[in-house]
Amino acid sequence: MDKIIVEGGQTRLQGQVVIEGAKNAVLPLLAATILPSQGKTLLTNVPILSDVFTMNNVVRGLDIQVDFNCDKKEILVDASGDILDVAPYEFVSQMRASIVVLGPILARNGHAKVSMPGGCTIGSRPIDLHLKGLEAMGATITQNGGDITAQAEKLKGANIYMDFPSVGATQNLMMAATLASGTTTIENAAREPEIVDLAQLLNKMGAKVKGAGTETLTIIGVDALHGTEHDVVQDRIEAGTFMVAAAMTSGNVLVKDAIWEHNRPLISKLMEMGVEVSEEEDGIRVKADTKKLKPVTVKTLPHPGFPTDMQAQFTALMAVVNGESTMIETVFENRFQHLEEMRRMGLQTEILRDTAMIHGGRALQGAPVMSTDLRASAALILAGMVAQGQTVVGQLTHLDRGYYQFHEKLAALGANIKRVSEA
C-alpha cells in the first residue's frame, strides 16, 4: 500500500498544470459503448485511472472487445457482436458508477442483471431513481439479495419526473431511452457538463437526444446505434482541485484547458473570497494571497450549483482563511469524514448534521492521516502542503480512482511531495 508524504509550510505553487479527461464523464461514456450493434467506438482523452480500468473490465465482461491504449489515452470498443446480459460481480462491486450499465444492457438485450454497486462510502446514494425510471419505461425489476434483474422485450418511451436530479439516474435512463420505442421525456434531469458530454456521444452514435444541460431531456428512440469517435470532456473537478491548491498556497497557477463555464460556481466563490481568477487563451489562471482572503459560506447543490465533489477541497482552503467559514452539504450525507482527519492536524471545526463551521487561519500541523474517500484524499494532501511539518496520507486507493499522477503534478508546481511504497 502506497502513501504520500508532504513536507509543508513553505509551499507556494507556481507554473501550469495540464488537466485530464473527466472521470465522471468517461465512465458513463464507456457504458454507452455497450449500445452500438454496428461498428466500433473510439474514446480519446481518456484519463488513466483505476475506475476506468474497472469500467473497462465491466464492459469486457459482457463479451465486448475493449482495447485501452494508455500511451495514446484512447479506448477502442467493439460491441457489434452478441453480448452477455450479466455484468461481472467482481468489478461492479468495486465501483458505484457501474450501475449505469444497467440501462444500456437492458436496452440492447431486453434483459440485464447487475449486482449492487460499490465505491466511496459517502452516504447511502440510493439507486431507486434508476429503477423507477426503467419501470416507467416498461421494465420489470426484481431484487434478489445483492442482484438487480431487469427485463423488457422492448422498452417504451415514457414521461419520467425525477424527485432529485441524480446524475447517474439521468445517464442511465437517457442511454436506455435511445433504443426504446417512442419518445421519452425526463424532467428535473441532471444538468452537469458530463450529461452534455454523454448526449453528444449518443447523438454521434445516431441517437436523438435533445435538451442536455437543461432540466428537461427529450429522447426519441431509434432502432439501432453505431460506433463513432468522441473526445472526453476536460475534468472540471480536477481543474477545480488545482484552482483551490493555487489559492490556499498563495500561488500563481495556470490550469490549462480548464473550462470557465463548467467551473463557474467554484470560480464565483473563489472570487468572493478574494482570489484572482482570470480566463486566458489556454486555460484559467488563479492567483491569491491567503492573508487577504475572506471567509465565505458555501452550500453544495446539483449543477449549476457548487459541486459536492469540490466540497472537501474547499474546506481545506477555508482552513487557511482567517475567520469563520461555513460549508453546507446538501447533496450527500456523511461527507465530512475528512474534517475528522483534519482535526488531527489542528483544524478547529464544528459539525452539526449537514453543516460544518470552519474556524480558519490557525496554523495546521503535519500529522499522519487516512483518506476516507476520493475527494477527501485530495483535500488532505492540499492541507498537508500548508501545514507545518510532515503530513503522511495513507489509503491512496481512493485517490487513484480519480486523480492521475496527482503528486507529480503538485511537485512540478513546487510542492515538496513524494509517493512511497509501504513495506
UniProtKB/Swiss-Prot annotation:
Pathway: Cell wall biogenesis; peptidoglycan biosynthesis. The active site is at 120 (proton donor). GO terms for biological process: cell division; cell wall organization; peptidoglycan biosynthetic process; regulation of cell shape; UDP-N-acetylgalactosamine biosynthetic process. Its main location: cytoplasm. It is found in: Cytoplasm. One of its GO terms (cellular component) is cytoplasm. It is an enzyme of class 2 (transferase). UDP-N-acetyl-alpha-D-glucosamine binds at residues 96, 125-129, 309, 331. SUPFAM superfamilies: EPT/RTPC-like (SSF55205). Phosphoenolpyruvate binds at residues 23-24. Keywords: Cell cycle, Cell division, Cell shape, Cell wall biogenesis/degradation, Cytoplasm, Peptidoglycan synthesis, Pyruvate, Transferase. InterPro entries: Enolpyruvate_Tfrase_dom, Enolpyruvate_Tfrase_sf, MurA_subfamily, RNA3'P_cycl/enolpyr_Trfase_a/b, UDP_GlcNAc_COvinyl_MurA. The modification 2-(S-cysteinyl)pyruvic acid O-phosphothioketal is found at residue 120. Cell wall formation. Adds enolpyruvyl to UDP-N-acetylglucosamine. PANTHER family: UDP-N-ACETYLGLUCOSAMINE 1-CARBOXYVINYLTRANSFERASE (PTHR43783:SF1). Belongs to the EPSP synthase family. MurA subfamily. This is UDP-N-acetylglucosamine 1-carboxyvinyltransferase 2.
